[in-house]
Amino acid sequence: MYSTLGAKLDVVEMLDGLMQGADRDLVKVWQKMNAHRFDKLMLKTKTVGAEATADGIKVSFEGLDGSKSEGVYDLVLQAVGRTPNGKKIGADKAGVIVGDRGFIPVDVQMRTNVPHIFAIGDIVGQPMLAHKAVHEAHVAAEVASGDTKAQFDARVIPSVAYTDPEVAWVGLTEDEAKAKGIKVKKGLFPWTASGRAIANGRDEGFTKLLFDAESHQILGGGIVGTHAGDMIGEVALAIEMGADEVDIGKTIHPHPTLGESIGMAAEVAHGSCTDLPPQRK
């Protein structure tokens, strides 16, 4: 946003990449599209000091390898995330257990250890997302109204980076599968083969689905491109329903749309996609 308004930017990130949680191949597309927006992108770097001077704000950096550097800026925006306020709202005075970090533990009905007190949203733990909180609130309201069967039992919760292009992912990521040794089948459909993406002039993205190598059930998916956040809900539904690559691939998607790339990614995994040349084995 600041770059769009004409500001020159340096971005500092202590970890080894932006958008932690998303697969690196998704982020790579975003980074390539936005490289021109940054004068510097300093990864594995932390800010160790800032001092107001006559020329501006002098900021000191230190890399994880011990290297040191400085920069002078007109403005500094520090994004430090959020911390739960469980210890600040007096919940413990009502008998509610509050964890050491300030989170409040709840059961599947969003009850705290005090049966008539419920907690939802960021204060009950990760992921700190509004759409998760809304579903938790529904459960809490239903239980408080007398529904003894209501539970928060979502298998997956989608995440979206509302950037340009958008990055969205849900369920198991490819990086997680590799780290955990889970064997998966991948179906990746590049938007360079999407008629709608080409017509939009935005074919830089792709849609990726991951399936269990044996059962062929979908485990996760990621999308990078315009309106990725609008599309990821279908992948979440497929995971919740236990769909496999045939279920998704045989579902007729409207053409030409970006959404049909989900069906085509499933076809790629199945080996039946006719919109791409055959994959070499």
Task: Label each PLM-derived region with a short phrase.
Residues 145-146, 162-281:
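Flexible, glycine-rich terminal cap/loop adjacent to redox cofactors
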Residues 54, 100, 213-215:
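Short acidic-glycine loop/turn motifs at beta-strand connectors
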Residues 24, 53, 118, 223-224:
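Residue-level structural signal for beta-strand termini and adjacent loop
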Residues 69-146:
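FAD-site-proximal beta/loop scaffold in flavoenzymes
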Residues 1-67, 127-134, 142-176:
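Rossmann-like dinucleotide-binding cores of NAD(P)H-dependent redox enzymes
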Residues 49, 95, 109, 208-210:
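Short, surface-exposed charged micro-motifs
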Residues 12, 62, 98, 106, ...:
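Hydrophobic alpha-helical segments, especially N-terminal targeting/anchoring helices
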